[in-house]
Amino acid sequence: DSQKVDGVQLIRTIADKDKDEEAAKKALDLFVSSFESKIKKRVEILALNYGYNENVAFEAIRCAFNKVWLYPTFDMGKSSCTNEENAIIIWLVKIAFSQMCQFTRTGECAQISEEEDLSVIENIDDVVNSIHVADLDPMVKMQYVMAFKKKISVLDEKHRIIYLTYKAYQRSGKKLPRKLLEKLRKRLGLSQSAIRVYKKQ
């Protein structure tokens, strides 16, 4: 590169986004344009080694930079590299790999937008769309939907809505977003403790 970019300084500027968001956005743009080409090949090779295609590698890279914006936690002190640029490249490739695993598992990875579209899930089509079963092979998808329908056919309306909403939004051990719980309580006219009882049944 004709112009040497100080990646560590850019990450610091991104980390100060609460103080100066405009400068942080510019720093992120410069960071992406400088490092994207440097990690692209490595991430594509990783994807191929794990049986994924270029599209998955592309998403993983995009999400890795989203993650840098959300959590600019690079620490040169934790790197075994003495060269800052190489240390950042290795750090980014690790993030991209974890984002790749997340993307292939759930169909989504780190997004910069914090505001999610949180809606109470009332029927099976909504849950199928929300957990990205839509991308599956049609036969596999049909089997999944059939098994799912059988499972929820025995539930009454309140149990069904609670089960489907948790199924769509709950990520490994994490609680549902507070906004969504409020919507669920309002929709069903139940308290949070009543919802917990329903969920256990």
Language model features: what each stretch is:
Residues 55-66, 83-98:
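Structural recognition of an alpha-helix C-terminal capping motif at a helix-to-coil junction
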Residues 201:
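Alpha-helical DNA-recognition elements
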Residues 32, 149-183:
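Short amphipathic alpha helix immediately N-terminal
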Residues 53, 191-194, 198:
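Short coil turns linking two alpha-helices in DNA-binding domains
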Residues 18, 22, 119-153:
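Acidic, proline/glycine-rich intrinsically disordered inter-domain spacer in sigma factors
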Residues 76, 93-114:
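Arg/Lys-rich amphipathic alpha helix in sigma70-family domain 2
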